[in-house]
Amino acid sequence: MKRLEISILVSCILLSGCTKEPVEMDVLSSHSATSGNWYELNIDVIADKDTVSDRDACSNEIIQHVLDNDFHSTRFSYDLSGYPNEVTVDVFTSEKNFKKGKTAYSFDYVTDFNTENIDIQNNIKDNPDEFEIQYK
């Protein structure tokens, strides 16, 4: 009986060491650029999956994190420039792939530039219906 208990304990220890720790979606790097009334946000994101099978769902989740400003390691400052008028994202499945420069996919979350009144531009929070995801 004691031998069975030890075998079960050893098995549990080995199995717990073999399971992958879940990866939480997070920003690996970010860069913002402003010019007049235009604010662009460029981010590199690690997805919370080994592979990204549904780009649309993953992209929408990333944009929602940007809107909610709730990435684990990064907080964006929307108090000075407001919400972005454009977001460019490179998605990676792991930090290892990020270091290698191996993207899973990339996309832009864009709107048309308002040429009639350049002082009033769409942003991702106030005018989400004016934006679309464009895959590169």
Give a label for each model feature:
Residues 14-17:
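C-terminal motif of bacterial Sec signal peptides marking the signal peptidase cleavage site
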Residues 23-50:
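Extracytoplasmic/periplasm-facing segments of secreted or lipoprotein envelope proteins
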Residues 32-40, 79, 127-136:
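Exposed acidic/polar residues on beta-strands and adjacent loops within beta-sheet cores, strongest
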Residues 42-106:
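Mature extracytoplasmic domains of secretory-pathway proteins
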